[in-house]
Amino acid sequence: MKKNRLNLNGVVVINKAKDISSNKVLQQLKYLFNAQKAGHTGTLDPMATGVLPICFGRATKIAQYLLDADKEYIATIRLGIETDSGDAEGEIIAKSINIPELSAEYLEIVLAKFSGDVVQIPPMYSALKYNGQPLYKLAREGKTVEVKSRNIKIYELELLEFNIDSLKIRVKCSKGTYIRSLAIDIGKTLGCGGHLIALQRTQSGPFKLSEAFRLEQLKDLSFEQKIASITNIESVFIDKPIYSLLEEEKNDLYKRGLFADKPHLDGTVRIYDVEKFVAIAEFDKGKLINKKFFDQDILISE
């Protein structure tokens, strides 16, 4: 007989290990916590490691906010070899011995071309769909289709180290950025090709690697310690401004929706009733256009 599953609410930040899929991490965590409902916030490739927030219960309603959040990565690029997938798991499709002589000054000039607003073409080996079919399935069948480019933003691109045939970079970027595509494009710009050989996500939205748990750590915890590892829903929005409801605004917010003119507010805000976080709201030029209600104090609900 199966144990009754717990209706947990909140987020557990996982430090994903290499060679495990994001979905397998999700299923293992759901089993470890005996959770009724869980979902992740965007996949990491099996070869990638690092920050993978897992949402439980009511927190799954705000998973999209983490999907849309900025990310930070540490990436290592191998030069002189191209693969069909753009990473070390793919088949080699080209080799070059014409790797230029690298220097910090030269690489900084090259990397500067990829900072700011960038137009990027996602790789064929991705979960994006073409006529309803995931691109990676078409790629595995040997098919190639024209993939639409997308506008992304790279806020920070820092050279960490390099040697004669590789470089390591730190990338802070917007949603929708493919680090494999960045590795491919950097290799092309250097004139020798390249592919991604290591990737670690160090931050996803407000969640940093330093606060993430390895699955092995969680397996050794008591039930109480596991529950303590769940961070509340407000933590997802900890960098967002707070709007405290006035007494006369409460009925409008809870019943009809608050449409008051708030010219100083734009984007996502945290709504407080007295001293308690009760909702998130989207303001567009001071007008409330969307809201979601929470009771962040309830980690385990009926």
Curated annotation (Swiss-Prot):
<dbReference type="Pfam" id="PF16198">
    <property type="entry name" value="TruB_C_2"/>
</dbReference>
<keyword id="KW-0819">tRNA processing</keyword>
<dbReference type="GO" id="GO:0031119">
    <property type="term" value="P:tRNA pseudouridine synthesis"/>
</dbReference>
<comment type="similarity">
    <text>Belongs to the pseudouridine synthase TruB family. Type 1 subfamily.</text>
</comment>
<dbReference type="InterPro" id="IPR020103">
    <property type="entry name" value="PsdUridine_synth_cat_dom_sf"/>
</dbReference>
<dbReference type="GO" id="GO:0160148">
    <property type="term" value="F:tRNA pseudouridine(55) synthase activity"/>
</dbReference>
<dbReference type="GO" id="GO:0003723">
    <property type="term" value="F:RNA binding"/>
</dbReference>
<keyword id="KW-0413">Isomerase</keyword>
<dbReference type="InterPro" id="IPR002501">
    <property type="entry name" value="PsdUridine_synth_N"/>
</dbReference>
<comment type="function">
    <text>Responsible for synthesis of pseudouridine from uracil-55 in the psi GC loop of transfer RNAs.</text>
</comment>
<protein>
    <recommendedName>
        <fullName>tRNA pseudouridine synthase B</fullName>
        <ecNumber>5.4.99.25</ecNumber>
    </recommendedName>
</protein>
<dbReference type="InterPro" id="IPR032819">
    <property type="entry name" value="TruB_C"/>
</dbReference>
<dbReference type="GO" id="GO:1990481">
    <property type="term" value="P:mRNA pseudouridine synthesis"/>
</dbReference>
<dbReference type="Pfam" id="PF01509">
    <property type="entry name" value="TruB_N"/>
</dbReference>
<feature type="active site" description="Nucleophile">
    <location>
        <position position="45"/>
    </location>
</feature>
<dbReference type="InterPro" id="IPR014780">
    <property type="entry name" value="tRNA_psdUridine_synth_TruB"/>
</dbReference>
